[in-house]
Structure formats: structure tokens, C-alpha cells
Curated annotation (Swiss-Prot):
One GO term describing the cellular component: cytosolic large ribosomal subunit
Pfam families: Ribosomal_L6 (PF00347)
This protein's name: Large ribosomal subunit protein uL6
Its biological purpose: This protein binds to the 23S rRNA, and is important in its secondary structure. It is located near the subunit interface in the base of the L7/L12 stalk, and near the tRNA binding site of the peptidyltransferase center.
BP-aspect Gene Ontology terms: cytoplasmic translation
Keyword annotations: Ribonucleoprotein, Ribosomal protein, RNA-binding, rRNA-binding
Organism superkingdom: Bacteria
SUPFAM superfamilies: Ribosomal protein L6
GO MF annotation, one: structural constituent of ribosome
Subunit description: Part of the 50S ribosomal subunit.
InterPro entries: Ribosomal_uL6-like, Ribosomal_uL6-like_a/b-dom_sf, Ribosomal_uL6_a/b-dom, Ribosomal_uL6_bac-type, Ribosomal_uL6_CS
Length: 179
């Protein structure tokens, strides 16, 4: 049995949760998120809590899915109340990022051309400087995916450390080959 699935989620007062079959709809001050829960998971609303369990009590996979569903719904509640963000930093001579419009990023990353990145719906970018941005949104998975996509354009290389990296990422710089 999943230890995570056994813990109920306390629903905050400013969040409303609607259960329609296996669909969970979470509404909060920052927006609304929907997620379809696996068929082997039973979700119940008891007082001001959400309780997750397996439909088949002896099924190990059902309890594993219940733990996953509980974590996903908990992330949805956190997203619509507080939100998620990832901070990215650029290291390198001439590496710049600028916000063209509310949905476009222009990146100069040492290539012969400027890279344009169109932001998906629900993602917002805030520029701290030309070398630092913050990716914000209510969907944890989407914020992480956009940050990973931006980082993939120029990953930090191990010899000089140039590239895009997360703010908390530590890049170990290798020593150059000696003759």
C-alpha cells in the first residue's frame, strides 16, 4: 500500500475542487487545472479533504496509481494558489534573452541566427536581466518542460561553462587537455 496515497489532502478555503467521474477540476485564484485520474483510483471528497484509495484493495498497482494521483492533485492545488517558477541563467559572451511580446522569446546564443521561442498557453516569462529569466505558470509539468526546452538550445558545456542553466544547477568545469 502506498504511504503517500494514505495521507488526505486538506483543501484550502480559496480552492474549489470538482469531481466528475475520474476528472478532477481544481479552481483557485491563479486559474483552473483539469486532470484525468487513472481508472484504478477512487477519489472521495470527505468534509474539506480529498481521500485517495485503490478501487481493488489487494492491487499493488492500484495503490501505486493512487499515490501518483494524490501527488498530481496536490501539485495542482499548489499551482492554482501559489504557482510554480523556474529561474534560468545564461553564461557566455554575447548570450542574451529578450521578451519580444507576451508570447515570444528571442535568444542570442552564439549561433549564426536568433532563436525565436513561442511560449505555450499558460506560461509567462519575466526578465530579470539580459542573462536571467523566470518561467512562471500554474502547471508544474508545463513549467518544467518549457524550462527544459529553453535549456536544450544551449546546454552548459563542461570546459568553459557556457550555456543555459538552472539557477541552482552546479556545472563542474573540467580542466583542459595539457600538452
Amino acid at each position: 500500500m502506498s504511504r503517500i496515497a494514505k495521507q488526505p489532502i486538506v483543501i484550502p478555503s480559496d480552492v474549489s475542487i470538482t469531481l466528475i467521474g475520474q476528472m478532477v477540476i481544481v479552481k483557485g485564484s491563479k486559474g483552473e487545472l483539469k486532470r484525468l485520474i487513472h481508472d484504478s483510483v477512487l477519489v472521495k471528497s470527505v468534509k474539506s479533504c480529498l481521500v485517495f484509495s485503490s478501487r481493488i484493495n489487494s492491487s499493488v498497482k492500484g495503490w501505486a496509481q493512487a499515490g501518483t494521483a494524490r501527488s498530481l492533485v496536490n501539485s495542482m492545488i499548489h499551482g492554482v494558489t501559489v504557482g510554480f517558477f523556474k529561474k534560468l541563467k545564461l553564461f557566455g559572451v554575447g548570450y542574451r534573452i529578450s521578451i519580444n511580446s507576451s508570447k515570444n522569446l528571442n535568444m542570442s546564443l552564439g549561433y549564426s541566427h536568433i532563436i525565436e521561442y513561442v511560449l505555450p498557453f499558460g506560461i509567462f516569462v519575466e526578465s530579470i536581466s539580459q542573462a536571467e529569466i523566470i518561467v512562471k505558470g500554474i502547471n508544474k509539468q508545463l513549467v518544467g518542460q518549457v524550462a527544459a526546452n529553453l535549456r536544450a538550445y544551449r546546454k552548459s558545456e563542461p570546459y568553459k561553462g557556457k550555456g543555459i542553466r538552472y539557477s541552482n544547477e552546479i556545472v563542474r568545469v573540467k580542466e583542459a587537455k595539457k600538452k
